[in-house]
C-alpha cells in the first residue's frame, strides 16, 4: 500500500477541510455527521461502512457522494485531509494506525484504544507520521462545563472539582460482551473531565472499584490529587436510579454545580440564589443536542486545528494521560 504524499499541515483558513468518515452507526450519525455537516469549515466527501444500508442512509441524509466498502480504497481515491474513525473500541487500533500511516489527520471516538499502551503507541504513530489526532472527549467542550470553568477561574484557580457519571444498568451485562470495561469504554468521560477541570498532572489516587450485583466492575470511585494543587473526586456508578452526568467546579468564593445536558448554576459569596444560570441551549444559541452538549464544539476545534496545524487539545498524547488515570484507578484501590 503506497503512502500518499502529505499535504502541508498549515492550511489557508478559508479552504474547507475534506473529511472522510469510517462508520455510520448511531453515535456517528447523531453527533459527528451533523456537526461536520453544519460546519462551514468542513466538507464530508465520503463514507466507508461495511453495512450498505447504514452507509447509504447516512450518505443520503447528509448529501455525501463518496460511498465505499473499503476505507483504504476511500482514502486512496478521495485523498481526504482528515479521517474520522467512529467504531467500537476493540476494532480501532489497526484502522487508526493504517489511516495515520496513509498520511491523514485522525479523529476518533472515546476511548481511543483498549489500553493506555495502545494509546501511547497511537500518539507515537501520529508524531512519526506528522499528523494531527483528536479524541471525542466532548464534555470538555460542553458550554456548561467549559464556560463554567472559565467563570470560576476569574476568581482564581480551581482548587476542587467533582465529576460524576451515573447510569441505571441494573442487570445489564458488560460492554461489547465483555471486550472492554465500563470505566475505559464509557465512564472515561468523567475521568477526562476531572483531569480537564483540575489541570496539572496526576500525583496520587485512592479508589474503590466494585462489582455490585454483577460479574463485571460497574462502580468506580476515586479521590485524585493533581500537581496544580487541585483535588478531584470521581463518582461513576452504573447501579443508580437514572442516567446523569454532573460536575462541581470550585474556585475561591465561587462554584459551579451543573450538568452539561440539563444545565447548571454559578454561585458566589455565600448567596443562596445563583448569580448566573447556565442553560446549554441558550449558551450555544441552539436547541440541537449536538450543538448544546459539546459535540459540535469538539468537532469544530479539531477542524480548526487541521486548518492551522495546531495540535488538538484532546490529541492522542493527552488522551494517554486520561487512559493512564484509568489504570491508576484500578491499581490504587483502598
Task: Spell out what each predicted region is.
Residues 2-16, 82-85, 227, 301-334:
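C-terminal helix-rich "cap/oligomerization" subdomain common to oxidoreductases
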Residues 138, 248-317, 321:
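C-terminal glycine/acidic-rich active-site capping loop/insertion
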Amino acid at each position: 500500500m503506497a503512502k500518499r504524499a502529505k499535504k502541508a499541515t498549515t492550511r489557508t483558513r478559508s479552504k474547507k477541510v475534506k473529511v472522510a468518515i469510517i462508520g455510520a452507526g448511531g453515535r456517528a450519525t447523531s453527533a459527528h455527521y451533523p456537526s461536520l455537516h453544519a460546519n462551514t469549515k468542513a466538507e464530508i466527501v465520503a463514507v466507508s461502512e461495511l453495512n450498505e444500508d447504514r452507509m447509504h442512509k447516512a450518505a443520503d441524509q447528509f448529501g455525501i457522494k463518496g460511498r465505499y466498502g473499503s476505507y483504504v480504497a476511500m482514502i486512496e481515491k478521495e485523498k481526504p485531509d482528515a479521517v474520522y474513525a467512529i467504531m467500537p473500541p476493540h476494532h480501532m487500533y489497526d484502522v487508526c494506525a493504517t489511516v495515520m500511516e496513509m498520511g491523514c489527520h485522525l479523529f476518533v471516538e472515546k476511548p481511543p484504544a483498549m489500553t493506555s499502551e495502545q494509546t501511547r503507541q497511537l500518539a507515537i504513530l501520529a508524531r512519526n507520521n506528522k499528523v494531527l489526532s483528536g479524541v471525542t472527549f466532548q464534555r470538555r467542550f460542553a458550554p456548561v462545563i467549559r464556560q463554567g470553568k472559565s467563570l470560576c477561574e476569574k476568581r482564581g484557580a480551581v482548587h476542587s472539582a467533582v465529576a460524576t457519571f451515573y447510569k441505571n444498568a441494573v442487570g445489564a451485562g458488560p460492554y461489547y460482551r465483555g471486550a472492554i470495561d465500563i470505566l475505559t469504554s464509557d465512564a472515561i468521560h468523567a475521568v477526562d473531565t476531572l483531569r480537564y477541570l483540575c489541570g496539572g498532572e496526576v500525583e496520587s489516587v485512592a479508589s474503590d472499584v466494585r462489582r455490585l450485583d454483577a460479574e463485571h466492575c460497574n462502580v468506580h470511585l476515586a479521590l485524585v490529587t493533581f500537581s496544580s494543587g487541585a483535588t478531584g473526586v470521581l463518582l461513576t456508578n452504573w447501579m443508580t436510579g437514572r442516567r446523569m452526568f454532573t460536575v462541581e467546579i470550585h474556585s475561591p468564593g465561587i462554584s459551579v454545580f451543573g450538568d452539561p445536558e440539563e444545565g447548571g448554576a454559578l454561585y458566589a459569596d455565600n448567596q443562596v440564589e445563583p448569580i448566573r444560570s447556565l442553560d446549554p441551549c441558550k449558551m450555544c444559541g441552539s436547541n440541537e443536542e449536538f450543538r448544546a452538549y459539546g459535540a459540535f464544539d469538539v468537532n469544530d476545534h479539531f477542524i480548526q486545528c487541521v486548518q492551522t496545524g495546531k495540535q488538538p487539545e484532546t490529541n492522542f498524547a493527552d488522551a494517554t494521560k486520561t487512559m493512564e488515570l484509568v489504570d491508576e484507578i484500578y491499581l490504587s484501590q483502598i
